[in-house]
Amino acid sequence: MAVNIYDLAHDLDKGIRETPEFISLQDAYREVNENADAKAKFERFRDVQVTIQEKQMTGQEIDDETVDVAQKVAQEVQENELIVKLMEKEQAMSTIINDLNRIIMTPLQDLYNVAND
């Protein structure tokens, strides 16, 4: 019987959304967005992250000013308990996603390992 891999992917999507980790992440994200100070700091933090990633991807040097801003914003974020909680929940979801990715990649790893034996 042929498996529709996309149906499995949609089932996985649904399953992820039903995990306690995802639900906790949603709750933490909502709490950050409901607090004006936390929301502003979190948005600024994400903007700085995107700026740094864009520079890295385009091979641009990350100047001292960008580093200073990133450090300052990171410090502000670490002082906000709502954002810290959100980041902890993100880390838990990241662990799950990494585990799933490892499982998904197993067939390719097995294929190449067999081919190299």
UniProtKB/Swiss-Prot annotation:
Similarity comment text for this entry: Belongs to the UPF0342 family.
NCBIfam families: PRK13676.1-2
Record's protein name: UPF0342 protein LMHCC_0319
Species: Listeria monocytogenes serotype 4a (strain HCC23)
Native organism taxonomy: Bacteria, Bacillati, Bacillota, Bacilli, Bacillales
